[in-house]
Curated annotation (Swiss-Prot):
SUPFAM superfamilies in UniProt: Spermadhesin, CUB domain
Protein name (database record): Major seminal plasma glycoprotein PSP-II
Source organism, top-level taxon: Eukaryota
Complex formation: Monomer or heterodimer with PSP-I (depending on the type of glycosylation of PSP-I).
Gene Ontology BP terms: single fertilization
Source organism per UniProt: Sus scrofa
UniProt entry tagged with the keyword Transcription regulation: no
Localization per record: Secreted
Tissue-level expression: Seminal plasma or sperm.
Domain (CUB): residue spans on this chain: 30-131
Signal peptide: 1-21
Disulfide bonds: 30-51, 74-95
Entry similarity comment: Belongs to the spermadhesin family.
This protein's GO CC annotations: extracellular region
Length: 137
């Protein structure tokens, strides 16, 4: 395994260990501003077509986010990740992939889930944690 592919997998495994403290669940969590230093987000409220979560770390931290596996119905639903708020730059709309990792440029990252009405929702799980300055991973 090349070093370039080993790093995302190592990050995913270490993230899964770190996030046991704060799991975001329940339909009332959609639209929440999350200030936990680590946790996970999943689409537990499958009735909503559109949902956003904003992760806010301490001012001196960046947000590290990892999606171990994503298998949404492409063309019918997607997850979009923003560096900062919804008005910030988008990393793109994602519907499938594995070992997907993002690092914010500041202390905020926003996740948007969007689904075309009338289509069923696919499950997903996203891990996040705060990264201090100077740490590579």
């Amino acid at each position: 395994m090349k070093l370039g592919t080993a790093i995302p997998w190592a990050l995913l495994l270490s993230t899964a260990t770190l996030v046991s403290t704060a799991r975001i669940n329940g339909p009332d969590e959609c639209g929440r501003v999350i200030k936990d230093t680590s946790g996970s987000i999943s689409n537990t409220d499958r009735q909503k077509n559109l949902c956003t979560w904003t992760i806010l770390m301490k001012p001196d931290q960046k947000v590290r986010m990892a999606i171990p596996y994503l298998n949404l119905a492409c063309g019918k639903e997607y997850v979009e990740v923003f560096d900062g708020l919804l008005s910030g730059p988008s990393y793109g709309k994602l519907c499938a992939g594995a070992a997907i990792v993002f690092l914010s440029t500041a202390n905020t990252m926003t996740i948007k889930y969007n689904r075309i009405s009338g289509n069923s929702s696919s499950p997903f799980l996203i891990y996040f944690y705060g990264s201090s300055p100077g740490s590579e991973y």
